[in-house]
Amino acid sequence: MNNEEIFKGNGIGEFRVNIAEIVETGITGARILPDNTDHILAVSGLSAEVTIHVVNEGEEEDNLSFTAWKGGISKKEFKRLRNMGTDIFSLKFLNESCNFFFTTRSNDWRIMMRETELYPLCFIYPGHELKITELLTGQSLTVPGTAGNFYALNLEAVRLKFFTDYGVLANLFDVYSGDTFALRIGIEQSPTVRERYRLRFLNSYGTYEVFSLEGEASVTPGMDEDEDAVFRRYDEITDDYYSDRIRTEIQEAVTIKTGFKRPQEIRFLLDLLSSDDVYLSGYGREEIKVIPSAEEFSYRVRPDAPQNVTLKLTFADKESNWTGEITESGYRKPKVHSKEFSKQFN
């Protein structure tokens, strides 16, 4: 796998080998830095080249080669596509006349997101040159790449290009592969709120996306009642025992409302809740890995109104030492031009 031998085994007779967990070790994943100024970013680590070499008892040999991707689709859709004689790659990812991006935000020809949810969209470069047309001015931007390679479209850099060249804050784009229309991308203004948080998560297709939260957050420190944490210690002065304990670990949990979300965003939220890799930003200076859940969450089969959902984000790490955030300038008196300063001139 990736020119390296990972697994070697043998067996007798007819047998099956599930190689999914073995192959997954060769897919490292990659975090894309959205502050890059390139329009598209080359992405690696999200797939692996796999070769299986088989030799039977009769010394007959055969090779099977394929590209493995981390992620998948629902069992229901997998069965349906199999009965149709197709797969998600032929139907979507390698189809230049449709929404070919690795996003679960949308299941049609349009992708809508808020400004606070902008994050590079991953895709396999189509057979023809990619072109992005801004609908207000009609101006186009050509984004060259190599067909079949994996890239991420940097929407922030694309918007900056149109703003710099044409003086327009672009919010609506049409994406073409050559002369073939593929999809439309719309960017909405985020509501003005007192508190805002973001969740970056690994979606079902194996790429990262961002979900914006516009509700007020509250923190609940969770303490484990461990009987072994309390013990008896001997006091030489009184010749008696007294109770003592080791430092107690506390696991924080943040409760927050999502803000009102449309039906399509609620489906997107379901993918977030099932993700195995979720990070919270906006709570501190750095992202924090969390485990999301939703209590008493239900939605209508045919929804006709936005919905506000309460999420519980449990921190992945437990802490027994509480020192606050440590910053380089946090222990010095702030100057006039610091991010935080008093009205008194210093």
What are these model-derived regions, one by one?
Residues M1-T192:
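Preference for solvent-exposed, low-hydrophobicity sequence contexts
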Residues N2-I6, T180-N346:
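Extracellular/virion structural assembly segments
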